[in-house]
Structure formats: structure tokens, C-alpha cells
Amino acid sequence: MAGLRSYIFIDQLQPKTMCYLGTFCRGFLPRANLAALVIEVAPGLDIEPLTDIAVKSVDVKPGILVVERQFGYLEFHSHSTASVKAAGDAILAELGASAKDAMRPEVLASKIVKRIDNYHALLINRNKLGSMILPSESLFVLEMQPAAYAILAANEAEKAANVKIVDYRMMGATGRVYLSGEESNIRAAARAAEQALELRMAA
């Protein structure tokens, strides 16, 4: 039986978070403000029959289906919040689980770096696929497990403040988020991202 690591409902995908998703999305590309659900399970191959259930139960579009070394990931979305929730409910029924059975996030690192140096900005930009961080901007970095919570943190941070999505990694052993912008906006975004995870920790 698959173990439910992450079950993340997103009420509205924010534009920058959605665009970054497009850098590694191999399925149907989402649009801004769509509802979405991200599911992470172990072992990884168990995500395949769960995907079958989701796409056959209601009209949702799968954007990501990845089986990696240990875990499997599925993201699907729709203009209809009800359809996304119904597909999620069908998956939970198959697992004999509830959303509360998903693992709670654990924050491993959370740091703000003020006024990034030219060389530091260059090194970050060489390894990222999102917006470029500029010298003198502030940088927020966040690491958590399970990894899928990275998309929730990025999305909630973008709702709260005008920041750039430099990078987020939502698959693998840990998730990571890189955000940049003016220091005041970065601090607001950091609070929003941390609070989103804290709410899941307390659930």
C-alpha cells in the first residue's frame, strides 16, 4: 500500500509559481489562478495507478507525473475547484487515507541573505531556471521535507509579496525554494512561506 507523503491543495496557482512549474512540466500546462493538487507517495511506482484514478474520475488535467528513485509525484489542475477536490478524494479513497494522513512538513533551513554580491548572484543564476537574482537584491532560501511542500511555500510567498521566483525544487529527498527581491518584500514572503508550512505542521 502506498504511503501518502504529501497531499497539497492549492486554491489558486500564482502566475510566477505557475510559470516556473512550466520549466519541468511534461504534461498539460496549467494557467494562473487554476486550482491544483500535488500528491507525493512512496513507493514511487504507486503513483501510476493513482494517476489513472484521478484522470478517469473527473475532468482534471495532469501536469506532472514523475517516478523518481524513492517517491512518485502527481500534479493535476482544473478551472473547477470542485473537480480537483473530487479527484483528490478518489485518490484518498483508493489509499484508504485522509488528507491529514500526509506527512507534516519539517523545515530544515530558512535564511535571508541581504544585498547579494555580484559574484554570488552570478553563481545562483547559472544554476537556476527561474527569474534572475540581481546584485544588491535580498535572497530567501527555504528547505523542507517532504519535498513537494516547496510549491506550497512558493505559491503562498508570491501571494503575500512582490518577489521573484528564482527556483523551487519539489521532488527528491528535500524541497528547496529560492526567492529574491527588495528586503521588505522578501521578509513578508518568508513569513508567508513559513506560516503556510506551520499550518500544515499543526494540522
Question: How should these model regions be labeled?
Answer:
Residues 1-41, 45-48, 57, 101-131, ...:
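Intrinsically disordered, low-complexity polar/charged tails and linkers
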Residues 28-32, 64-69, 131-134, 158-159, ...:
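Solvent-exposed alpha-helices and their adjacent loops that cap or buttress functional pockets
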Residues 74-110:
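Hydrophobic, ordered structural segments
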Residues 82-96, 185-200:
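Charge-rich, low-aromatic oligomerization/scaffolding segments with amphipathic character
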